[in-house]
Every structure is written in structure tokens, then in C-alpha cells.
């Protein structure tokens, strides 16, 4: 029989249960058990009990919302940022730094099946030297929204402050908002990037329509009054420097010049410790030949070259290879060779692969380094240091080395992004 009306949806009462969280996941959710499954509860910390409303019930896990928290964990702290819980930037400001680090270390140890030997961390606040803020002009209010995206949304949280930004950049926010709001072309602004180099701040403004002469003058005056380097980006691939000098930062005492488009580590303090730890773990000797894979513009390569006989850096982004070569030249390092090669392809025929090496360092992107693991084994270096931004691909790639007879000597959790779910790490493998 034909049906000419919508069938009524079956309404089920949302079940309310009482549970206790036992773990904290990377997204700041408490993890409890219910009906033999993991139950994820935003905002609940380990050892906290709560009345929870079940909001989603899948075959392997459930989700819930806290209706009433019955006790507070001693690790619960007041979030420092007024935007926490709405802004998608941070997930764990309600948890103590100690709990954040122990939760990440436990997750890393579980994946790697090895204890975490050390935690490398820095200041938990004011650490972020780079940020991209979205811009959106609201015609109804005639105001410019400037901020970060909401979690799982394209909506912008109009931020007035951001305590994880380095203080110099956070202090710029109200002045920057006023400057951009006053532009005639405020409707055509896409986003603004802020970076604090060691020689001062820089700003990249993405605009989708040509800026008027008065707007350019306002921006240039702003850059001079706040002593920052100004770049304009009329298109995603075009960058015009309007004022200021080339930005640079120090790595192991070396000056590394970079472009605003180049990748640099967001957390300078942890980056410095990470470079020093890699050098220590590799135990670089004056006669060593060292290979640095996914080398970028030389964050590890050049410090290694100060200690080794020779260093080869391999990188898939040509602009970073060119920057690495320039930085080697400017720092009078003539024992470094850079190769522009795609490390996701067959590496055995690439020119760098014909060399022999005593030590290897690799720092791949989130996808890991499955294409190079067998060749590293073939090279048979005495030590391998793997720096990772994704523990899942690190665990996968590690299996190849472990199967070839390497052993994990040291495992460190890098707290590169406090108050977020990002987990970075580094491992020393030795034959």
C-alpha cells in the first residue's frame, strides 16, 4: 500500500547513567566503561563520577554529556582562556599540565609497547609563536570577526585573547583588530597569520580583492608602529613583502632564515630541547656521516653538520631545500648536501640512497615514513632517531626496525602543544 505521509520516528528516552572516568583521551574527553564499551564524555576527568546522558550508542563505543558532576578531580583546574570550550584550538585547559602529560605519555607507551623514559616540555602558556586567525566581515553588524574556528565547525570564535600565544603576539591582537576593521576593504579579508621570529614579529594578510592605496598606507603605518614585517598575499601562491626584514630564528646557535610559508616548529622552547636531545641521542662523532630525512629547511641538519664529518638532508618541498642550502651557506657549513626528492616514491634509485651513513634522523609528516624504512634497514646505521607528530604511524614504522634487530633505547614524549590533543614524540633505535 502506498504511504503518503512520513512515518513517525521512534522516540527513545535518553538514558541517564552514573559512571566514573578512568582515562583522558587526547581530545579532553573522559573515558569510562558502559556495557563493555568505551564511553566518551567531554569535560570529565579521570576519577570523576557523574550522571551522564547517553547521546550516541554505537556498536563499539558510546558518547555522553555530563548532566551533573558528582565530584571534582584534584587535577581539575580553571581554564585560563574565556573562549575555552567554544574555540576549537584547545581541548584540555580544564586538566592540570601534569595530568595532560601523564595521559599523553600513557597513550604513547601503550602504542609503542615501551615505557616513556622522559618528557620534554617547556612553558605551558605563551608558547605558540605562530597562529593563523580567520577573518570574516559581518554586514549586519558591520564588524570584522577575527579568531579561530569552533570545534568541528567553520564558524569563527571572535577571540579577544589567546593565552597560548607568545605574549608579544597576544598583545598585538586588539591593535590588529582595530587596524583591520578600519580598512575600506575589510569585506575582502580572508585570514591573517602572525609569526614571532627571533628578530621580531611578522604578519601575512590574505586578501581576496586589491587593496586601495589608503588601506596599504594604513597597513604599512601599522607595521612600522608595531615594528613588524608585513607581507600581503593577494593570492594563495603570491607573497609580497611590504616592510621589514627576512625573518629568522636560532637553532643550536645557528641563524635559520625562513619565509612565512616555510614550516617551522610552533613551540620554540621545546624545539630547542628536541634538537639538543636528537644530537645527544645520535652521539654524533667528528667522523660520522649522518642522513636527515624529511629535513625541511635544516632545523636538525645544520646543527648536526656542526658536529659530523658530513650530513645529507633530503626533503620533498623544493622551497625548503633552497632555504636549507642558503642557510648552510650563510652559516659557513660546507659539509652539508641537500637533495630535493619525494620520499614517498621508490627511494632506492634516488641519488642520496647510493651513499653510506653511520647515523640517521627522520622527522616525517603525519603520514609517517613507510617508503624509507626498508632502505634505512639496508643502510644499517648504528643509531636511528625518529621524530614523530603521529604516534600511530610511528608505531607502524617502528615495527620494521624492530623486526630487523633494532631495539628502542629511549622514548620521549614531546609536549609541543600543551592544552591540545597533539602528541609528539621521539625514539632512539640502536642495533
UniProtKB/Swiss-Prot annotation:
Segments forming domain TRAM: 8-68
Active site, renumbered: 389
Binding site for [4Fe-4S] cluster: 81, 87, 90, 162
Record keyword Translocase present: no
Reactions it catalyzes: uridine(1939) in 23S rRNA + S-adenosyl-L-methionine = 5-methyluridine(1939) in 23S rRNA + S-adenosyl-L-homocysteine + H(+)
Superkingdom to which the source organism belongs: Bacteria
Gene3D superfamilies xrefs: 2.40.50.1070, Nucleic acid-binding proteins, Vaccinia Virus protein VP39
GO process terms (BP): rRNA base methylation
Annotated Pfam families: TRAM, tRNA_U5-meth_tr
Sections of the chain in a coiled coil: none
E.C. designation(s): 2.1.1.190
Keyword annotations of the record: 4Fe-4S, Iron, Iron-sulfur, Metal-binding, Methyltransferase, rRNA processing, S-adenosyl-L-methionine, Transferase
Protein family (similarity comment): Belongs to the class I-like SAM-binding methyltransferase superfamily. RNA M5U methyltransferase family. RlmD subfamily.
Described purpose of this protein according to its UniProt entry: Catalyzes the formation of 5-methyl-uridine at position 1939 (m5U1939) in 23S rRNA.
HAMAP family for the chain: 23SrRNA_methyltr_RlmD
Name listed for the protein in its UniProt record: 23S rRNA (uracil(1939)-C(5))-methyltransferase RlmD
Amino acid at each position: 500500500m502506498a504511504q503518503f505521509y512520513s512515518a513517525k520516528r521512534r522516540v527513545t528516552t535518553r538514558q541517564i547513567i552514573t559512571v566514573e572516568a578512568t582515562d583522558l583521551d587526547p581530545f579532553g574527553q573522559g573515558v569510562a566503561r558502559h556495557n563493555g564499551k568505551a564511553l566518551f564524555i567531554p569535560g570529565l576527568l579521570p576519577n570523576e563520577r557523574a550522571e551522564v546522558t547517553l547521546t550516541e550508542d554505537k556498536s563499539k563505543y558510546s558518547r555522553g554529556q555530563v548532566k551533573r558532576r558528582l565530584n571534582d578531580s584534584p587535577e581539575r583546574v580553571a581554564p585560563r582562556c574565556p573562549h575555552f570550550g567554544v574555540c576549537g584550538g584547545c581541548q584540555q585547559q580544564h586538566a592540570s599540565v601534569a595530568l595532560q602529560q601523564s595521559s599523553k605519555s600513557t597513550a604513547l607507551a601503550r602504542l609503542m609497547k615501551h615505557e616513556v623514559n622522559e618528557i620534554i616540555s617547556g612553558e605551558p602558556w605563551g608558547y605558540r609563536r605562530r597562529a593563523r586567525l580567520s577573518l570574516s566581515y559581518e554586514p549586519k553588524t558591520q564588524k570584522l570577526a577575527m579568531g579561530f574556528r569552533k570545534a568541528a565547525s567553520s564558524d569563527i570564535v571572535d577571540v579577544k585573547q589567546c593565552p597560548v600565544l607568545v605574549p608579544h603576539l597576544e598583545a598585538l591582537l586588539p591593535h590588529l583588530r582595530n587596524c583591520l576593521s578600519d580598512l575600506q576593504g575589510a569585506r575582502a579579508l580572508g585570514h591573517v597569520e602572525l609569526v614571532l621570529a627571533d628578530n621580531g614579529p611578522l604578519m601575512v594578510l590574505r586578501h581576496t580583492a586589491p587593496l586601495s592605496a589608503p588601506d596599504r598606507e594604513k597597513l604599512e603605518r601599522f607595521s612600522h608602529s608595531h615594528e613588524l614585517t608585513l607581507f600581503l598575499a593577494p593570492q594563495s601562491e603570491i607573497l609580497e613583502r611590504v616592510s621589514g626584514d627576512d625573518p629568522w630564528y636560532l637553532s643550536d646557535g645557528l641563524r635559520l632564515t625562513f619565509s612565512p610559508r616555510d614550516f617551522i616548529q610552533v613551540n620554540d622552547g621545546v624545539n630547542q630541547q628536541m634538537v639538543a636531545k636528537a644530537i645527544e641521542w645520535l652521539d654524533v662523532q667528528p667522523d660520522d656521516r649522518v642522513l636527515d630525512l624529511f629535513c625541511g629547511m635544516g632545523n636538525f641538519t645544520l646543527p648536526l653538520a656542526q658536529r659530523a664529518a658530513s650530513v645529507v638532508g633530503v626533503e620533498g618541498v623544493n622551497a625548503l631545500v633552497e632555504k636549507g642550502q642558503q642557510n648552510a651557506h650563510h652559516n659557513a657549513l660546507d659539509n652539508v648536501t641537500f637533495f630535493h626528492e619525494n620520499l614517498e616514491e621508490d627511494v632506492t634509485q634516488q641519488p642520496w640512497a647510493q651513499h653510506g651513513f653511520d647515523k640517521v634522523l627522520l622527522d616525517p609528516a603525519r603520514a609517517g615514513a613507510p617508503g624509507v624504512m626498508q632502505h634505512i634497514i639496508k643502510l644499517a646505521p648504528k643509531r636511528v632517531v625518529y621524530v614523530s607528530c603521529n604516534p600511530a604511524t610511528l608505531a607502524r614504522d617502528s615495527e620494521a626496525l624492530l623486526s630487523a634487530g633494532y631495539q628502542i633505547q629511549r622514548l620521549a614524549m614531546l609536549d609541543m602543544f600543551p592544552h591540545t590533543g597533539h602528541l609528539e614524540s621521539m625514539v632512539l633505535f640502536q642495533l
